[in-house]
């Protein structure tokens, strides 16, 4: 009796053990999530476009809006970042589908075609699709006028019946293909050519040189391109504003997508996203055709002569930023003079020149060295509560109107409920320093704050134009395959843990008060 009981107990134990073993095997055989694979690999593989907005190699290493966001996302995941830049957008989605990259981070429109095949992340800015033409030529103001122009080209060309199609080209697998394809169903006469051996920047250049009549790009890309090709102009808009986002693979596994949602939610709430967008695209709205044409000529005629001088003395600064500052000051004229007494390449006042050891303001080498030293001293005074990448804009405003007036603008910003550590907020208050109702309550009084704002924004535009001009030849060799890993110039930039300081949140007041002054007093000292 005891033996039978023991045997039953033995069988029960063996059965229970078998169930446990089977369960363990099933648990081990469950596929790992996307997020777990990335953690195990220790690397987030990001595909992006090599251009002046998403990703480029600067003097201090990788830069660009999408690069900085991707670096921060990798930090959040606790892994290293591996950037795989492409020259052609057409290479990105196939690489994502094959699993060669984990994310596309280059600001693509959420078109219906892309959304069906891949999962878009949160929108982080908006653009419209625009038809672009060359200033001075026939401007179609809608799709019907464009079709009329193409029809006239067909009738004029006896040798090529497709002459109309060759007037409008777009990039293969771009967000513009489904837009024009849908329009062609509505307007069968519409003609366009899809090219696979060029990117949008190439086509924009061809429009500027007259090799191509029209192309399609987005509103941000056009604004950036106009700094290099001022003849480019908007013909008409094809779409309303559309969301721009990153993309991941579409599957039942939402682990990486969930992390992406949380990441963008956090940086939006903290203001970090707005700060980065201000850094890269906050300056592109205004466009002066005449000034830009003169600047582009100077890039070819004058910059090659003075670039070595800017590179020699820039030290911790990007030499292209120093070049932009010098152009704003003197248009790269070493003998420049002003009725107000400022002189030279960097337009130094006599007291400023003496303070930085400049004995001859009209000597370009002394002027550049002195101007950089003066800027360095101002940057050192800018409060550490301001994000590192925004300090330079506050310093440039101080270079123009004086440090005290810049601090007044910060106090005014805080009093009105803005963030005194965010350039986007402070630059909007600078013009108020002209108005008596505001400057009468400030410490340093009246100032031409609107000129200081324009001064800084001009320098930012010149800076981006120089970046684009210098990098028209790709940062990597043309023979290099797309999506090849580019080793960073500074490996520390790709290691998680180097989290940047986020500007502290500030609660504003409705009036300028002594309390506001006291909060910023220590920073000014």
Curated annotation (Swiss-Prot):
Where is the protein localized?
Answer: Cell outer membrane
Q: Where is this region: Disordered?
A: 506-525
Give residue spans, biased composition: Acidic residues.
Answer: 514-525
As its record notes, the protein acts as a catalyst of: Exolytic cleavage of the (1->4)-beta-glycosidic linkage between N-acetylmuramic acid (MurNAc) and N-acetylglucosamine (GlcNAc) residues in peptidoglycan, from either the reducing or the non-reducing ends of the peptidoglycan chains, with concomitant formation of a 1,6-anhydrobond in the MurNAc residue
- Spell out the Pfam families in the cross-references: SBP_bac_3 (PF00497), SLT (PF01464)
Q: What is its EC number?
A: 4.2.2.n1
Q: What class of enzyme is it?
A: lyase
Region annotated Non-LT domain, chain positions: 25-284
The positions making up the signal sequence are: 1-24
Its membrane topology is listed as: Peripheral membrane protein
Give the SUPFAM superfamilies listed for this entry.
Lysozyme-like (SSF53955), Periplasmic binding protein-like II (SSF53850)
Instruction: Show the segment(s) annotated as LT domain.
Output: 286-525
Q: Which residue positions are annotated as catalytic?
A: 329
User: Which GO biological process entries does UniProt record here?
Assistant: cell wall macromolecule catabolic process; cell wall organization; peptidoglycan catabolic process
Which Gene Ontology terms cover its molecular function?
peptidoglycan lytic transglycosylase activity
| Keyword set, alphabetical order | Cell outer membrane, Cell wall biogenesis/degradation, Lyase, Membrane, Signal
**Cellular component terms per the entry's GO annotation:** cell outer membrane
Q: What's this protein's function?
A: Murein-degrading enzyme that degrades murein glycan strands and insoluble, high-molecular weight murein sacculi, with the concomitant formation of a 1,6-anhydromuramoyl product. Lytic transglycosylases (LTs) play an integral role in the metabolism of the peptidoglycan (PG) sacculus. Their lytic action creates space within the PG sacculus to allow for its expansion as well as for the insertion of various structures such as secretion systems and flagella.
Instruction: Name the NCBIfam families for this protein.
Output: PRK10859.1
Domain-level remarks: The N-terminal domain does not have lytic activity and probably modulates enzymatic activity. The C-terminal domain is the catalytic active domain.
Q: Which family does it belong to?
A: In the N-terminal section; belongs to the bacterial solute-binding protein 3 family.
**What is this protein identified as?**
Membrane-bound lytic murein transglycosylase F
């Amino acid at each position: 009796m005891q033996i039978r009981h023991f045997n039953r107990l033995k069988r029960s134990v063996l059965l229970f053990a078998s169930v446990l073993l089977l369960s363990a095997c099933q648990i081990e055989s469950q596929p790992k999530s996307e997020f777990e694979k990335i953690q195990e690999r220790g690397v987030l593989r990001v595909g992006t476009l090599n251009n002046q907005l998403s990703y480029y190699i600067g003097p201090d290493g990788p830069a660009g809006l999408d690069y900085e966001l991707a670096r921060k996302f990798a930090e959040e995941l606790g892994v290293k970042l591996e950037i795989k830049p492409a020259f052609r957008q057409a290479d990105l989605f196939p690489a994502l589908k094959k699993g060669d990259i984990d994310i596309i981070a280059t600001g693509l429109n959420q078109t219906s075609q892309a959304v069906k095949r891949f999962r878009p992340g949160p929108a982080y800015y908006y653009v419209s699709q625009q038809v672009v033409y060359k200033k001075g030529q026939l401007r179609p103001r809608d799709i019907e006028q464009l079709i009329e122009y193409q029809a006239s080209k067909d009738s004029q060309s006896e040798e090529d019946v497709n002459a109309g199609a060759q007037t409008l080209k777009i990039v293969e697998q771009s967000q513009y293909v489904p837009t024009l394809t849908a329009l062609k169903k509505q307007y069968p006469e519409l003609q366009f050519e899809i090219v696979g051996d060029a990117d949008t920047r190439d086509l924009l250049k061809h429009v500027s040189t007259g090799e191509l009549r029209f192309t399609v790009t987005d509103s941000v890309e056009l604004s950036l391109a106009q700094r290099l090709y001022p003849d480019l102009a908007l013909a008409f808009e094809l779409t309303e504003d559309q969301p721009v986002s990153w993309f991941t693979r579409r599957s039942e596994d939402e682990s990486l997508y969930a992390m992406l949602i949380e990441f963008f939610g956090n940086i939006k709430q903290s203001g970090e996203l707005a700060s980065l967008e201000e850094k890269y695209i906050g300056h592109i709205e205004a466009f002066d055709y005449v000034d830009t044409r003169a600047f582009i000529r100077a890039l070819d005629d004058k910059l090659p002569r003075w670039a070595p001088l800017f590179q020699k003395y820039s030290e911790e600064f990007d030499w292209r930023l120093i070049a932009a500052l010098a152009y704003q000051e003197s248009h790269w004229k070493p003998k420049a003079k002003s009725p107000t007494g400022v002189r030279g390449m960097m337009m130094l006042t006599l007291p400023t020149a003496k303070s930085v050891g400049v004995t001859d303001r009209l000597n370009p080498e002394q002027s550049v060295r002195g101007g950089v030293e003066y800027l360095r001293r101002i940057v050192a005074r800018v409060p550490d509560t301001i994000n590192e990448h925004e300090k330079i804009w506050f310093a440039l405003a101080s270079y123009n109107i004086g440090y005290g007036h810049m601090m007044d603008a910060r106090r005014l910003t805080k009093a009105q409920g803005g963030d005194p550590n965010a350039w986007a907020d402070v630059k909007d208050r600078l013009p108020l320093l002209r108005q008596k109702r505001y400057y009468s309550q400030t410490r340093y009084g009246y100032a031409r704050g609107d000129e200081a704002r324009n001064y800084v924004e001009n320098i930012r535009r010149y800076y981006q134009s120089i970046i684009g001009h210098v990098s028209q030849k790709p940062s990597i060799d043309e023979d290099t395959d797309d999506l090849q890993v580019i080793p960073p110039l500074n490996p520390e930039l790709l290691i998680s843990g180097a989290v940047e300081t986020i500007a502290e949140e500030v609660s504003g007041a409705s009036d300028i008060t002594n309390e506001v002054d006291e909060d910023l007093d220590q920073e000014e000292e």
